[in-house]
Amino acid sequence: TDELSVLEHLKHISNDEFLQIALDGATTDHVLSSQLEHVSEEDTHTVLSVGGNDLLNNISFLTQDFRYSPNRVLEQLRQMLLPINKNYEAIVQKLTDYRATPLLCTVYEGDLVGSEEFDSIAESARSMVSFFNDSIYRIGSKYNIEVLELREIFVTSEDYANPIEPSHKGGQKFAKEIVRWVDNE
């Protein structure tokens, strides 16, 4: 079967019009500096799924040899996440300027266990994702915006094409949740 992207799945299962402004590899910096300008007043819904690449760009944090107390390590993690969290909230704040109803998506955990590149940090990466997702929930609550929990959608290895990217099946599940959300709005 052909491997469809989330956008292709959306177009296949819904008669609504969809525009993807996300770029592969984009971070919260990219979204703030160049992607939000593509949101228009005609849009009725926006889906924000960003932050995973920011975490991926900081994955080396998990391989550091810390000789600190757990408190100090957690403080280091908080400091590392701070600019990402600030960017994320700035994006959400800008999205509230548009008439489109936003949906925030948590960062999924990836299929890291057993992968050559990420197996040794799979569990700590899951914790790092949880710390960031906590910020997404907090920001969603602050701005009264619904949050879609991607960790409940991407649950098996079949949902991933590789340790990081969703597969055809995972993308289809994500698209179905987006359509369900749009239809229930």
Predicted regions and their residues:
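Alpha-helical cap/lid subdomain in secreted, periplasmic
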Residues: 36-168, 172-185
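Ser/Thr-centric signal marking residues that sit
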Residues: 1, 28, 106
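Serine-esterase "nucleophile elbow" of acetyl-processing enzymes
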Residues: 1-24, 38-42
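Residues at alpha-helix caps and immediate loop-helix transition turns in enzyme cores, especially N-
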Residues: 6, 31-32, 170
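Structural motif
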Residues: 25-34
